[in-house]
Amino acid sequence: MKTLIDSISAEVMKAFTENGYDAKYGKVTLSNRPDLCEYQCNGAMAAAKEYKCAPFMISDKIAEGLKDNAMFESVESVKPGFINLKLSKDYLASVVTSMKEDEGRFGCDKTDDPKTIIVDYGGANVAKPLHVGHLRSAIIGESVKRIGKFMGHHVIGDVHLGDWGLQMGLIIVELKERKPELVYFDENYEGEYPKEAPFTISELEDIYPTASKKSKEDEAFREAAMEATSELQRGRRGYRALLEHILNVSVTDLKKNYDNLNVSFELWKGESDAQPYIPGMVQMMKDEGYAYMSEGALVVDVKEDTDTKEIPPCIILKSDGASLYSTTDLATIVMRMEDYSPDSIIYLADQRQSMHFIQVFRCARKTGLVDDHVKLIHIGFGTMNGKDGKPFKTRDGGVMRLEYLLDEINEEMLKKITENQKEKENLDISDEEAKKTARMVALAAIKYGDLSNQASKDYIFDIERFTSFEGNTGPYILYTIVRIKSILAKYQANGKDLPNGAILPAHSASEKNLMLVLSRFNAMMENAYEELAPHKICAYIYELANAFNGFYHENKILAQEDESIKDSYISLLMLTKGVLETCIDVLGFSAPDRM
């Protein structure tokens, strides 16, 4: 279905052409003065320069040419040359009726040119619990992936686990100190290794920080860890078997924690999966003359003539021959191109890593790891801060585990929902339902609180504000959906089936406003996809929720005596609910049936 703004522009462009002017001047925009009109065209101002006449002479002609067009209720030429447009109620009703008939899509067509897109997000490390620093990558990445899928693209989410490097050696050496009798440490052992891991997730989460602390204080321990890392990377059997156990135990726990965030991945590949691609890639870079030695390291120049700041060379191998993050990221690109031939790879990572991605992307292009048509995109996000404006910490200044943060918000939400029920004396909700509802609303509070901000901006994580049922919050959006569900349930409780007829022309300004906001859904979704911008969806559903609540407070819906008008209202509510639910699903949360 064509976007409404394109349909309006087509009519205005036609009027420009019919009056002898270039169609390009007929482009229409949303009105920046909604008190005066709904859409506007400022093209006469620019056209006046080309056609050497006063702008209002052009705008007058266009307005005259459109005055009998059934699309418009009014077309007004305003000096010095603006064209103000109001849509006819009949036309708008036909637009929202078409949306309602297109169930599940609501006028937003899937692309006819589907692309393969890999979204690299999550950033989890094995043997370490998720903490609040992982929140933004997971939340934004999941939404970007869902937006792409909704638009009809083949989108693959990859967690890209941190499962390589010194951290593995640290775990192995600490485990050896604690359990030296394990067969994994016997170099002469040739049998099969146990299928069950020799540690639990809680043990593993204690082993790593202990080992990390020791390595900073004990040089011999650190050297042993570096040697264990080298042996693992050279393929020592026992250490490889331990790596498998570490991965299995960690991934099981990570999946559980990501599930609590309603985040899932199609791929659970890690840095270790890219290692086999490194030798061939490095050799190619040497053979083709891209890589050269500089101060003992192997590097590739990535600076360009148009650079306004210094872009250092991309280091491929350190002086001791060890690989770096850049090496692994480049090898991962090689692996992804081989396995999936993606058209785009999108990375979700802190914006402070922007230089790293500039170097990696330029190196990948220069050395031919990707074709020219492949897009490499870094969505750099800002910091989640506490009320003091500094990075979010626990009360004692530590980094908060993600599960503890979720528990804290769940408790806050449960308290509010319980109080809400007491106030309404609606005590038929069981403890189990209240807890389930609290979890759903808490997730909406966290995700909406994050996604409603432009990704690149820092934001204040304010539990009190995020969990409020009023204002621009997740709970307010859910409360609006639940209100609509309640009205529809009452309508059906009277023994009536939900209507499937046309939506009638608006009977009030608030109803027309609701229709106008609904009619922008497909254009908004296209824009959110093009700009990889979940915050555009948040801004839209907040406007839609406000438009619905304005309509709800000004109109009797179930008490409407005219049955045809009542059925039209119910149809409009069904569409509003469908659009809101589609949007929150793309944002990564859902609404309960009651609150």
How would you name each of these model-derived features?
Residues 1-21:
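Generic start-of-chain signal for non-secretory N-termini
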Residues 17, 21-46, 51-595:
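NTP-dependent nucleotidyl-transfer catalytic core
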